Amino acid sequence: CIATQNHYGAIGTQALPESQLDRFMICMHIGYPDMKYELEIVKGKITTDPLDLVEPVMNGAQLLQLQEEIHKIYIHDAVYQYIGKLVNATRKHSLIELGISPRGTIALARMVQALAYLRGRNYVLPVDVEDVFIDVEAHRIQLNGKARVNRVTAEQVLKDILEGTTKPSVVKK
């Protein structure tokens, strides 16, 4: 499931409750396209419906097979411990009111398996965790009033947690 999110405070929008935010695996900020590309998008939309150009890249059975392959990607105990330490740090951080849930921990483990697969490995490295931690978890945590008053972002807090957590050295299985 892919969704777009309007800026909070825009007319007709309300923040999603934590229980719904927690069901999205990853949150990415794409930003605006440059003017040249945006005009290409507009011109293309006027002459053709972009949905008419969409073609499937795999069928449902192939997708399920791919998911099975990804779930077999090996995660060393030291990497699991690393994930656990990062998650636990969000639950104890002085600027976080609501830390990462078990669902968020599972999402992080699944995402690092997918990233290792895309990188051509059958095992996860700590760098895989570092590379997706903020994108997978920033939308899941709730900052407290002190953080909001000081205009601290969830991304900044998670970056601090990453930098303050010792990364394990793991060798290939």
Residue ranges and their predicted role:
Residues K92-K173:
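C-terminal engagement/docking regions of AAA+ P-loop ATPases
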Residues C1-I73, Q113-L115:
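Canonical AAA+ ATPase core
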Residues L16, Y37, Y74, A78, ...:
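Alpha-helix N-cap and coil->helix boundary residues
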Residues P17, G31, P56, K72-H76, ...:
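Alpha-helix initiation/capping motif
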Residues L53-L108:
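Conserved AAA+ ATPase small/helical "lid" subdomain
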